[in-house]
Amino acid sequence: MTQIKIKRVYEDPKTVDGCRVLVDRLWPRGMKKERLKYDVWEKDISPSTELRKWFHEDPVEHWEGFSAMYRKELETSETARNFLTKIKPYKTVTLLYASKEPVRNHARILQQFLETHLGES
């Protein structure tokens, strides 16, 4: 089964990262395109713009609601289903995100979603 890791875009790449996937809708601040080592940018699997903006108004207060709404977006997303199919051949996939918050960020929710659905297949 595919192992799903998450990592900030500002951390150095490692060979154990496997396929490195940028999962932010917006390009990371201060990161030059030639500096970021990634294999694919899957911005359409990130939260919708409206959901992202709402979450950033108050990340602590909105975390639980954001988590539930983003999971719902993923469950109904053809992009998410296609992404699951795309990553199955890889031994390791590392989801790259820019947030300074290691726990309350969309990459962690996406990681859980992917692990759950990869385990079902």
List the predicted regions and their residue ranges.
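Residues lining hydrophobic/aromatic ligand-binding pockets adjacent to catalytic sites
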Residues: 1-121
